[in-house]
Amino acid sequence: MWWTGVTCNAGFYERALPRPAADPPNLPDEKLPVRPLCGDRRPLCAGGDRGGDYTYCFGSNDIIYTALGKFNSIATGVRINPVQHPAKLRAAAHHFTYRCSHYGLGEDDESLIAWRRQSRVVTGHDVWLGHNAVVMGGVTLGDGAVVGAGAVVTHDVAPYEIVGGVPARHIGWRYPPELIAAMERIRWWDWSHDMLRERLRDFDDAAAFCRKFDPQ
């Protein structure tokens, strides 16, 4: 019900918001409650992208040039689209060949910087990223995907697929195929806040949830 404000390292913006007069019960003091669907949010990610409704992260994270879906759960230490040096393209992998102005060597090489902007990461909805996971540039994480703690994801992850390891490999699926298909048809992440409140306890059992709300 609450989108949680956080303060993170490079790639995130601090939410310096006052605490409301009446907090929801059991909300930890270190988190600032912000209503979902709050409209004029500041960007969550370096590059101007915004987090989807109800998406949250904890602790220190670096998220760059990424489009985050709704209801994403991002643990501490996650890095999405980290810097990739041109180690195989250039005679030197160091910044000085493209961030030239930092070293008094002339103008920056905007072509390489533009390439990084284009190599975006896209996450679907209800995606869970475990502690210290890394998602490399150009990767798409499907709806419901789960990335294990410490994984390094270098390829796309299918909807509701579970991956882990270095590099990340297929571990399993959250649900059997028929439930995955039903979840994609239901698209509960598009429900209104009032609908979520009314149907909250239906989420307790995935199979029963699909039987009740699958439009087919």
Over which residues does each language-model region extend?
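N-terminal capping/interface segment
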Residues: 1-29
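Flexible, glycine/small-residue-enriched loop-and-beta-strand segment within the central core
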Residues: 21-24, 29-139, 166
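Leloir-type glycosyltransferase catalytic cores
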Residues: 114, 119, 187, 192-201, ...
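Beta-rich strand-turn-strand
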Residues: 133-145, 151-155
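Conserved G/P- and acidic residue-centered "switch" motifs that form tight phosphate/ATP-binding loops
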Residues: 147, 165
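Short, charge-rich, low-complexity interaction segments located
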Residues: 166-175, 180
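C-terminal amphipathic helix plus adjacent low-complexity
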Residues: 204-216
